[in-house]
Design a protein with these regions (language model features):
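A common structural junction motif
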Residues: 232-233, 320-331, 374-376
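PLP-dependent enzyme catalytic core of the Aspartate aminotransferase-like
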Residues: 141, 254, 319, 335-376
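Conserved small-domain helix->loop->beta segment predominantly found in fold-type I
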Residues: 263-322, 341-349
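N-terminal glycine-rich, Lys/His-bearing helix-loop that initiates the first secondary-structure elements
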Residues: 1-43, 50
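Conserved PLP-enzyme active-site core in the AAT-like
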Residues: 9, 69-274, 279
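Positively charged, small/polar-rich N-terminal and surface patches that mediate targeting and assembly
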Residues: 2-4, 10, 51, 322, ...
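Conserved N-terminal alpha-helix of the aminotransferase class I/II PLP-enzyme fold
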Residues: 30-84, 89, 105-112
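Short, well-ordered beta-strand elements within core beta-sheets of diverse protein domains
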Residues: 244-253, 300-308, 355-360
Length: 376
């Protein structure tokens, strides 16, 4: 079955009681036992499972893993909760290799939460496979990949990272938030786990927070993540699951529009005299263009650019836009712009002349016109 059909119909059932086409929202926290004490209908308590979460998890597994029947997913209350569950599956003394430019929330989590728990991390430039290989230790248990990266849109060869991880007896996890399964499916490059902030492209409407981990059903690592989901309880509400699944139904058409708009903006910015650099893998001169073209079906809706004149000039551009919204996050219908270094704080390595853009679903000509007047 093609991806568009999976997105539109996976885990969809006509309500047997009413014939309703849209799924109901099951707000119940608890479910009735049979007379013999069994739960023949499959649900016990909504922290453990819920019909809305079950449908969302089934759909996510199909989106990332296809119809092989071997993929499963665990939904969480946020992308950070999903990420934390992967790291919680490790043990004190385990070693992680992570990108040196990974999402600042993930970097802080590893440094400030899991380092005191005894989890060691090496932050490495993952565009340099040899550097990653040199970072492997006897206690390496996880190679964490983010591609495209945030906010410089570096591209990592997922298959190469998975091979390095597996040769060391470690797992490879890929944060696929920026690409979405519409554009990139890390399992096809031998990743073991795929992580999402479903807040972003999957839900797609800036109105629900969530996360997910997708893995192989028979993987001990993934089963550990599932146990953490159950016992620690950072799960999404039934309504959050319902909203996310509703957003997924339009994911393919949205991602095509995001990608097309971003490509047009990137080409405009590349030719602008007030822009010193554009970071977008769809540009032929991007260092990771060839890898992105191989492992992605399109180049996505995120880009960043650096403004000639430094921090003050970049801040002035962000202040001068009229259509773009000055806000963090990404993947929604509205175009967002932010001065990323200000968000990440004093320890950031992000250039202070850089603006990150989440390109929305507006007309590309209108967006270009807005940036043109803001750049001057």
């Amino acid at each position: 079955m093609n991806f568009e059909t999976i997105a539109a119909q996976a885990a969809h059932q006509i309500d047997p009681a009413t014939g309703a086409v849209a799924p109901p929202i099951y707000l119940s926290t608890t479910f009735e036992r049979d007379a013999d004490g069994e739960y023949s209908r499959g649900f016990v308590y909504s922290r453990v499972d819920n019909p809305n979460r079950h449908a969302l998890e089934e759909c996510l597994a199909l989106l990332e893993g296809g119809e092989t029947g071997n993929a499963a997913s665990a939904a969480f209350a946020s992308g950070s909760a999903a990420t934390a569950a992967v790291f919680q599956a490790l043990a004190p003394g385990d070693h992680v290799i992570a990108p040196d430019d990974c999402y600042h929330g993930t970097s802080r989590m590893l440094r400030e939460v899991f380092a005191p728990w005894g989890v060691e991390t090496s932050f490495v430039d993952m565009t340099d496979a040899d550097a990653v290989q040199r970072s492997v230790r006897p206690n390496t248990r996880l190679v964490w990949v983010e591609t495209p990266s945030n906010p410089l849109l570096k591209i990592t060869d997922i298959a190469r990272m998975a091979a390095i991880a597996h040769s060391a007896g470690a797992a490879c996890a890929c944060d696929n938030t920026w690409a979405s399964p519409m554009l990139q499916r890390p399992f096809e490059s031998d990743a073991d786990l795929v992580v999402h902030s479903t807040t972003k492209y999957l839900s797609g409407h800036e109105d629900v927070t969530g996360g997910a981990v997708v893995g192989r059903e028979d993987s001990p690592f993934f089963q550990r993540v599932r146990l953490i989901q159950n016992l620690c309880g950072a799960v999404p509400s039934p309504f959050d699951c319902w909203l996310t699944l509703r957003g997924i139904r339009t994911l393919p058409v949205r991602m095509r529009a995001h990608s097309a708009n971003a490509g047009q903006l990137a080409r405009f910015l590349e030719d602008h005299s007030q822009v010193s650099a554009v970071h977008y893998p769809g540009l032929p001169d991007h260092p990771g263009h060839d890898i992105a073209a191989r492992q992605m079906s399109d180049f996505g809706g995120m880009l960043s650019f650096q403004v000639a004149g430094g921090r003050e000039a970049a801040m002035a551009v962000a202040a001068g836009v009229k259509l773009f919204v000055r806000a963090t996050s990404l993947g929604g219908t509205q175009s967002l712009i932010e001065h990323r270094a200000s968000i990440e704080g004093p320890d950031t390595t992000t250039p202070d002349d850089l603006l990150r853009v989440s390109v929305g679903l507006e007309n590309a000509d209108d967006l270009i016109g807005d940036l043109a007047q803001a750049l001057g």
